[in-house]
């Protein structure tokens, strides 16, 4: 390993101190490092692409930003949690040195997480394309939020959804906005999407789990809401127009992450989401 990118969240008060410690640790091992200061707003950093590792130093939002940059460049991500929740960033500040040493010595396994691809088409032309580690959300952003969406999967129509919006999440994103909206939680190794309506007009519009090998199409229909957007991981946003189409499929890119083993996933479900009601169940 020769060069490491450190994505530093400037919003975290203790991030700079830990960043200096990481820089010194890497320097002592003959590894160069470059610090990118992430402000929570920037979208596409202009960085070189010759990094061997990207260290995310912040909360889950910093991990999402780092993952979207790293995945197409095949750069592994080492996520250190400085946030309040830290469901994706499972490496705690007190653990970073030991975990990073394990990684450098080849003793830390990397686990792949799938991303979704969201292509926005207008008048039969692609205007922009994004990748998301968590989700793509189509919603009304004004006072009138109810929108109408024509949704199909592999050419099969699901009909018209009347709702405040819909969430299309990856297994990683199934623990986030989708779960808060009543969607199921998926194991990260499951190859699937979750389609979750947001405050649907009809009670029969329930969440759906769909194979990631397929393609979903979401078409914007006339509605009361005039301000409609698609949000990528809650960080990238595009305004939509009537008849725009969002094409969602599995991205060919995957992000390799440290500290994201199946064991850590289920530990996080218990400790951070209160799954099963207790982190230390007692058996009679």
From Swiss-Prot:
The active site is at residue 60. It is an enzyme of class 2 (transferase). InterPro entries: ATP-NAD_kinase_N, ATP-NAD_kinase_PpnK-typ_C, NAD/diacylglycerol_kinase_sf, NADK. One of its GO terms (molecular function) is metal ion binding. NAD(+) binds at residues 60-61, 134-135, 145, 162, 164, 235. GO terms for biological process: NAD metabolic process; NADP biosynthetic process. It catalyses: NAD(+) + ATP = ADP + NADP(+) + H(+). It is found in: Cytoplasm. Keywords: ATP-binding, Cytoplasm, Kinase, NAD, NADP, Nucleotide-binding, Transferase. Its cofactor is a divalent metal cation. GO terms for cellular component: cytoplasm. The keyword Ribosomal protein does not apply. Involved in the regulation of the intracellular balance of NAD and NADP, and is a key enzyme in the biosynthesis of NADP. Catalyzes specifically the phosphorylation on 2'-hydroxyl of the adenosine moiety of NAD to yield NADP. Belongs to the NAD kinase family. This is NAD kinase. It comes from Treponema denticola (strain ATCC 35405 / DSM 14222 / CIP 103919 / JCM 8153 / KCTC 15104).
């Amino acid at each position: 390993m020769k060069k490491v990118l450190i994505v530093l969240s400037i919003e975290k008060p203790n991030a700079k101190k830990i960043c200096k410690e990481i820089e010194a640790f890497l320097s002592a091992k003959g590894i160069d490092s470059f610090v990118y200061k992430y402000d929570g707003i920037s979208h596409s950093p202009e960085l070189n692409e010759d990094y061997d590792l990207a260290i995310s130093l912040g909360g889950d939002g910093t991990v999402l930003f780092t993952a979207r940059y790293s995945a197409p460049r095949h750069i592994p991500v080492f996520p250190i949690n400085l946030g309040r929740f830290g469901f994706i960033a499972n490496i705690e500040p007190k653990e970073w040195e030991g975990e990073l040493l394990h990684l450098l010595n080849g003793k830390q396994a990397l686990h792949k997480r799938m991303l979704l691809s969201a292509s926005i088409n207008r008048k039969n032309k692609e205007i922009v394309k994004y990748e998301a580690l968590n989700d793509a959300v189509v919603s009304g952003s004004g006072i009138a939020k109810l929108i109408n969406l024509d949704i199909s999967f592999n050419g099969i129509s699901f009909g018209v959804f009347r709702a405040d919006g819909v969430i299309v999440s990856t297994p990683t994103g199934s623990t986030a906005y989708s779960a808060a909206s009543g969607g199921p939680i998926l194991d990260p190794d499951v190859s699937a999407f979750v389609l979750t309506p947001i405050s649907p007009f009809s009670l029969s519009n329930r969440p759906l789990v769909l194979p990631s090998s397929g393609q979903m199409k979401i078409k914007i229909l006339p509605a009361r809401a005039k301000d409609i957007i698609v949000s990528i991981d809650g960080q990238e946003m595009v305004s939509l127009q009537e008849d725009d189409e969002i094409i969602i499929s599995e991205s060919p890119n995957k992000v390799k992450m440290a500290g994201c083993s199946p064991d850590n996933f289920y530990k996080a479900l218990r400790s951070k989401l209160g799954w099963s009601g207790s982190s230390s169940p007692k058996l009679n």
